[in-house]
């Protein structure tokens, strides 16, 4: 690779699993990439709901969900890493002029594209009091790739990539998210071959 070629950065992109992906965690999954650098990548699966509702999750952590609009929303399986830990993907809680240090929550990652991922319980406490981010997606667990691992999977045609559209995350019914993400590329699922990229 020429020295002046910038490394690939897929932060704020969707990874869309190709039909050949056999790992049950990732089959027909759409992963929102929160972070991608030469050190690796971190993302959340946005289309695999668990049987637990947000209300049920709040009961498990001794909180009462104070947001009627979120009561029936499912908690998602974010990936196979740290599956007992909660991750909250939400709209940024501060204006563009404010610094990264001004998040109202103790542990928040700022993502280009107007989103944040918070792992501290204070975001749940804000939701319990009827406040907090307007739109949220809560997962148990996350997806991670080590240095060069995602690039290797991309070279093997395990994933399609496309810039993220937050409406797919927050406004699209769960069962339609895979097809909607494909649609961002002008594709439909019937167009994908399980053998793509393999001679």
From Swiss-Prot:
Instruction: Name one cellular component (GO) term.
Output: cytosol
* Top-level taxon: Bacteria
In the record, the note on similarity to other proteins reads: Belongs to the UPF0301 (AlgH) family.
Query: Protein name, please?
Result: UPF0301 protein Dtpsy_2896
What is the scientific name of the source organism?
Acidovorax ebreus (strain TPSY) (Diaphorobacter sp. (strain TPSY))
